[in-house]
């Protein structure tokens, strides 16, 4: 796919990354009816001892994420994508960069509001659906997709997946750790994000994953109850189960009065929080769980349908280190975008390698299918794919895709997915660089806008194409308008030929019969051309005129433009059904009639 955006040199270490698009740059920077606004939140499940000096929000569990995003959801933002900064590898020891995540929230703004229609509110739900081992095996992915589709049939909109790592050290951490609610929510742009102090909203849907099977006391409680059911006993089950109501979990045994806190679940704000254990009776050893995130609309909407697209990717290694990851993204995705598919998320791991020798592997990309309604045409999409190099100084982000998203937001480009990779390089300053694949899409521009943009590029060729039918039309009109004149000229040519023959017979000179035959042939050819060809002001285009004065019926003067070999030439061309066009260089007077005939030629 061609992209009009400028690309930097391949070996330039400072380049932000390659950019691919289905549009040229002027079209990319064309505004549409909507624009977007973004918010960014970095968080981790590591504690201060494990991740010192990081500004990322510390969460005791990924189930606390809805509480952190509560205020942004109240402002109309919804979660668009969530991802780790570095794609986890198969190594047992996880790096801090693999356990730092980013949540990207988006808010849609209409340039011309329609009748005060308010955008639909959403509720964020987090569910644990499987262990990471299931996603490493391609055979298990269809079952995973089926679980997502089952949730979608209940009205949920899939956002993404995120892993949570459990080690023996993490599981034995007591509740004396700083609760997630005590951390102030800090976004990258420091706008409209503040702390929700000690405020935990319960799950609006009253649906909590049954794998954990734990009930959680109030956030400030020092002594937490032990888990009723160990996660270890349900490892790999991969199914979400119904649990008792969140209100019943705050029964007489677990109900505690927290100073400054609110016990009542905040279901009106649309933020859901699942309860998590502060300490487990049976420690977990290096276990990883996959959590799925859904946006649940407050009002019933059409159920989403999802399908997968497999895209081959090429990786190169240096031992166990992955040096590069490449794919023809738009070659495999453009057709789905044009048909109305919307990219949601991508699944791949190094355990899905097809051919270790050539370094090929399949990435599974999840699309939301278009809903074709009655009397409505399918809305296609254009896309941008950015291979972004994100630079981390320790655990702090120095360079990322945030400026790019903010610059494209005013043109209506929506972030759909961020695919992390296991590529990690160290630059000269000692900072880490990792590649992230950023996907954006936008409704296709109207055809008028596309034609307007390309008008200058094709201006000259289009004028030529426009002039051709104009010439044909003009020729047709002139031919029909001069039809009677052509018939009249044909009659005059015949009369002039007879008069000329009479003059030649009386004149002296060699070969009068040959000269007469030449004139007769020329007259017949001219008459045929006048009846067949196109006339401009009484003169046939592309042929020499037999008579310059159509109104001269006396035949006193005749103009001719014969060649010395005109008889043979015209006879051969007439036999082939062609016109006899004589050039100006061949114009000569007729022997024996020089006094009566003046040679002339156009």
UniProtKB/Swiss-Prot annotation:
It is found in: Cell membrane. It comes from the Eukaryota. This is Raftlin. A lipid is attached at residue 2 (N-myristoyl glycine). Residues 468-477 have a biased composition (Basic residues). The keyword Iron-sulfur does not apply. Keywords: Cell membrane, Lipoprotein, Membrane, Myristate, Palmitate. Residues 197-209, 244-265 have a biased composition (Basic and acidic residues). Residues 178-282, 451-495, 524-567 are annotated as: Disordered. GO terms for cellular component: plasma membrane. May play a pivotal role in the formation and/or maintenance of lipid rafts. May regulate B-cell antigen receptor-mediated signaling. Disulfide bonds: none annotated. InterPro entries: Raftlin (IPR028169). It is a lipid-anchor. Residues 178-195 have a biased composition (Polar residues). The gene is RFTN1. It comes from Gallus gallus (Chicken). The keyword Plastid does not apply. A lipid is attached at residue 3 (S-palmitoyl cysteine). Belongs to the raftlin family.
């Amino acid at each position: 796919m061609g992209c009009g955006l400028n690309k930097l040199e391949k070996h330039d270490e400072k380049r932000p990354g390659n950019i691919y698009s289905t549009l040229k740059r002027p079209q990319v920077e064309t505004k549409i009816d909507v624009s977007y606004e973004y918010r960014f939140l970095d968080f981790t499940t590591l504690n201060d001892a494990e991740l010192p000096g990081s500004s990322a929000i510390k969460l005791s569990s990924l189930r606390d994420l809805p509480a952190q995003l509560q205020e942004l959801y109240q402002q109309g933002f919804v979660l668009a994508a969530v991802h780790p900064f570095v794609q986890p590898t198969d190594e047992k020891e996880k790096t801090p960069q693999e356990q730092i995540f980013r949540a990207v929230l988006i808010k849609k703004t209409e340039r011309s509001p329609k009748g005060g229609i308010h955008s639909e509110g959403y509720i964020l739900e987090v569910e644990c659906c499987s262990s990471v081992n299931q996603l490493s095996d391609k055979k298990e992915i269809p079952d995973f997709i089926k679980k997502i589709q089952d949730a979608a049939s209940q009205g949920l909109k899939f956002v993404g997946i995120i892993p949570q790592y459990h080690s023996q050290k993490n599981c034995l951490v007591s509740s004396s750790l700083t609760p997630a609610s005590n951390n102030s929510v800090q976004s990258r742009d420091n706008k409209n994000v503040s702390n929700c102090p000690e405020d935990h909203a319960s799950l609006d849907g009253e649906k909590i994953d049954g794998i954990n099977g734990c009930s959680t006391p109030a956030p400030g409680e020092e002594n937490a109850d032990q888990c009723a059911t160990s996660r270890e006993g349900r490892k790999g089950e991969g199914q979400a189960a119904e649990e008792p109501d969140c209100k019943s979990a705050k029964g007489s045994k677990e109900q505690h009065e927290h100073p400054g806190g609110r016990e009542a679940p905040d279901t009106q704000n649309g933020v859901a929080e699942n309860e998590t254990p502060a300490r487990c009776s049976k420690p977990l050893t290096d276990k990883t769980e996959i959590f799925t995130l859904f946006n649940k609309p407050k009002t019933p909407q059409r159920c989403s349908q999802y399908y997968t697209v497999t895209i081959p990717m090429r990786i190169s290694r240096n031992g166990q280190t992955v040096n590069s990851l490449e794919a023809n993204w738009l070659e495999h995705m453009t057709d789905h975008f044009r048909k109305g598919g919307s990219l949601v998320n991508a699944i791949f791991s190094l355990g899905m390698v097809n051919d270790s020798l050539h370094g090929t592997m399949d990435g599974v990309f999840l699309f939301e299918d278009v809903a074709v309604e009655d009397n409505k045409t399918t809305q296609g999409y254009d896309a941008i794919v950015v291979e972004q190099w994100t630079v981390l100084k320790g655990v702090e982000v120095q360079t990322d895709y945030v400026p790019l998203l903010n610059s494209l937001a005013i043109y209506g480009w929506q972030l759909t997915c961020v695919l992390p990779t296991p590529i990690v390089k160290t630059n000269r300053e000692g900072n880490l660089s990792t590649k992230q694949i950023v996907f954006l899409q936008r409704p296709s521009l109207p055809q008028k806008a596309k034609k307007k943009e390309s008008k200058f590029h094709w201006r000259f060729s289009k004028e030529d194409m426009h002039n051709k039918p104009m010439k044909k039309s003009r020729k047709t009109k002139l031919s029909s308008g001069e039809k009677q004149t052509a018939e009249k000229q044909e009659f005059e040519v015949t009369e002039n030929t007879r008069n000329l023959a009479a003059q030649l017979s009386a004149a002296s000179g060699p070969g009068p019969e040959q000269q007469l035959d030449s004139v007769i042939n020329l007259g017949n050819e001219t008459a045929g051309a006048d009846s067949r060809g196109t006339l401009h002001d009484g003169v046939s285009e592309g042929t020499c005129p037999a008579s310059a004065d159509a109104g001269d019926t006396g035949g006193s003067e005749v103009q001719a433009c014969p060649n010395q070999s005109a008889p043979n030439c015209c006879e051969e061309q007439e036999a082939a059904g062609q016109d006899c066009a004589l050039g100006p260089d061949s114009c000569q007077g007729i022997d024996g009639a020089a006094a009566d005939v003046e040679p002339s030629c156009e």
